[in-house]
Amino acid sequence: MSKRFPVDVILQHNIDGTIIPIRLRFTSEEGERQEYTIKGYRDLSGQETRTMPDGVYVIGSDLVYQCKLLVNKEQRMVYLHRKSDGSSWFMTVIK
């Protein structure tokens, strides 16, 4: 299972009910605060109950996004997951 990092997520809530992740912020393992604008995403929410490639078990009502970030001029892919109770978000890095 991939390591989970707690993140703050800025979201756009559209009139049609869709939710778009815009930015994320987290504290690195070195204790440094980092912020990234999401350059692209795929909404993987609302699908069947399953285990994601990062090892996280999700159900159909969970919010899950695969997001593209630009980190030190390199493209990185991450999964964003909202905890089932809706209290917080975490990210896992896709290798």
Predicted segment positions?
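Cysteine-centric segments in proteins
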Residues: 1-95
